[in-house]
Amino acid sequence: MSPDRLTPFYDKLPEMTRSTLAEVMRYLTLWIVFRDPPQHTRLRTLVNKAFLPGAINGFRPEIERITASLLDRLQPDSELDLVADFTMPLPALVIMGMMGVPENQLHNIKSWSDDIMLFVGSAQNTSEKYERARRGAVEMSEFFRAQVRARRAAPGSDLLSLLIAARDEHERLSEDELIATAMLLLFAGHETTTNLLSTAVLALMRNRDQYERFVRRPELAGTAVEEFLRYDAPASAMTRIVRMEHEVCGKPLKIGERVFAIINAANRDEEHFEKADALDIARNPNRHLTFGQGIHFCLGAQLARLEARIALPMLLTRFPEIAPGRDEPVWLDALIMRGLKSLPVRLGTSRV
């Protein structure tokens, strides 16, 4: 099985559509998540150190600062979209800070990511989505080329500077790989964590006993986050391309076929999880498959865990009476990602 699900799809598109998507493919085919060894191994080795638990734990004070700042902007007893006002900006600002990207670029980062997502995971099949994906990839790549020029003139200690040093000193990645990796880290560094935080709050509102349990016992954050990851995974499936004919459970698989491994189905397997359809924030053990397995295990798993373990208790401690808003939640139109486009809530009173 190969993770490169983009190339076979791209090759089957009409010539005009392929022309539109040429710049998108220029960068996305270089993303670690779509590459096989040895290219995958080389790129992963370059960025692994920045995402080891010891390095990630060093960002705890900054994550706490960003979380507190966002919570301070929320008005008690108001009705708002929690995605727009909290669960999206939090992980976006964290990864932007890690990469040395100015906070005033938040709107652009979100816009570019949304455009690229239309190609990576949207269920839509329209010409507009391809043009938007092209625009998002071009504008994000141009932004990072400017950032790279600035870092070369004045290097820092941020993640982008470390990638540039690896590129310039050892020539272990091309200039396009440098830009593509920066794009991936920024894109993946906030999209799935936004989904995790949003669906966690939704799950708690729909399971009030667990909500009240979490408010009473915020020390359960560790097991609670693992349960949110299992109960409604932020990426609902992994896609692979068949490289050689074989069978899985008696099902013949032919070269070039796409295989969707549905994570959320595995995470509700009654043979592995007692009362699998129930939300239990103290569930332990909890060997879910949300972060994947093997060489493609999620690079940002520790960062996502840390952000959620900090943000959710801080949110519920500040606003212990969050309830559904008047409007219904709006889900993302996506094949792979599982998250909310908007989550209307009523905050209730504040403890601060």
What are the language-model segments listed below?
Residues M1-V352:
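Cytochrome P450
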